[in-house]
Amino acid sequence: MRTRFSFPHHRVVTSGLMLGAAMLLTPASALAAPQGCDKSCLETMAAHYRAAYLAHDPRPLPLSPKLRFVENNVELRLPDGTWSTVTKEVGPALTLSDPRTGQVAVFTSIMQNDVPGFLAIRLKVQNRRITEVEHIISTRRNLSAPPTPIGDVESFTHDPDIARPVPVAERSSRADLIAQADGYFSTLENNDGNLRGGVRFLPDTTRFENGMKFPEVEKGFRLGRYHFNERVRDRDYFLVDEVRGVAMARAYIDHKGRLDHYALTDGTQTRSIFREPQSWGVMELFKIRKGVITAIEAVFVQTPYYMRSPFTAKPEMRAGGLTPPVTPPAPTSPAAANPILNEGGEEAAH
């Protein structure tokens, strides 16, 4: 049974909003000391950020003069976007951190007036100043056909094991944590029933997408259910929480919309829900124990086809494609159009 977690060692995060007023009174200079930012510093910074966000007031935050703020892949000034509209954090907030890269992330849920949404936040901290802020916010309001899945923010809870530390003797290396996450994305791309990159799952590994439950992850992959994914590109593993055994990434899943009917590996005939070019932008985390992915959580938002984040350093331009190749539509003729005119306003011969 999954319950809302409240761990004593997470007191700084879970109490962050209850002490929001006190946080907002903390001078920015007190947070902006010249030394580096360790794990507790990063997670405290995230708690301060959440409090400032809910107060619609970034002034107490130690923001870099060169701060970049991106929400749903669009670069904005801060405050703007949901900084202006958030009315409540439903939570519970799940915080992860990576002192080696100065990154801290939060998975939570919010209300904007009466509109619920799932929110993933990424902060980059250098010299105890926030230099980058990134949000992915998914709500029912911004869904269009085919919709990204979305669950109920009031009843959703995180898998409590995601936040638990892994015993030191059982911890995986950064490279191994990233390799499992990358194997997942490689399996999701052109999904044909094969597991790629050495990725491994428990029989009951479950994925939550915008709070909606998708159980038996490996079974879905073995069936080739996600064959419509042409590419999973611009994968950026920006945060590895080695203490908790979690790798987190940003990526984009491209759908060209050419695949129509296809067969699962068990022979079941099905049809792709993607009928035109579009992409999904995602922030996704993977809990890994002993080289096995045990839990997955993601926040998705629909984007224009082949969109990328302003933070993407080296954009991918690979062709992608499905195996076997999809037959392109038959050639057709142009529809009727208005007459072509010359400079005198007369119909031109053509």
Name what the model sees in each region.
Residues S15-P27:
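Bacterial N-terminal signal peptides
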Residues R2-M18:
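Bacterial N-terminal signal peptides that target proteins for export
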Residues L31-H350:
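C-terminal and inter-domain tail/linker signature
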